[in-house]
Amino acid sequence: MTHRSSRLEVGPVARGDVATIEHAELPPGWVLTTSGRISGVTEPGELSVHYPFPIADLVALDDALTYSSRACQVRFAIYLGDLGRDTAARAREILGKVPTPDNAVLLAVSPNQCAIEVVYGSQVRGRGAESAAPLGVAAASSAFEQGELVDGLISAIRVLSAGIAPG
């Protein structure tokens, strides 16, 4: 696989601390398992899954990934989380786990590290990915600077898609 990476540092988008909780502080119906995971039940009629983003944002993100993948005949994927010390190497490693890594584009974003990486497989090279990658990073960082994480992800995917020719 041949990969290309583009990186642009932006201001922090999100941050947080790891929290610990005592058993007595847990709400009723919640337990601390032996593995350290917190597990709980929900009240009847209440959602049992709490997504990190509003459902409308998740739908918009899914639509951007779906339509971009169809338009370019390339699998688009997003990774959101820590990328470690070598962000480009970690992004390439994550791309390798995508079902079709040779024909995929990964947008990897580490908000706490202020890092954005775009890597792609060998079948995408030569189809415009080289020039689309820095434009996608710029589109993402512009929205991230405004505190708009999901909009930045969607903008980057759309820009990448517009710059990559179908295979």
From Swiss-Prot:
One Gene Ontology cellular component: plasma membrane
Name of the featured protein: Uncharacterized protein Rv2468c
Lineage of the organism: Bacteria, Bacillati, Actinomycetota, Actinomycetes, Mycobacteriales
InterPro entries: DUF5130
Domain of life from the UniProt record: Bacteria
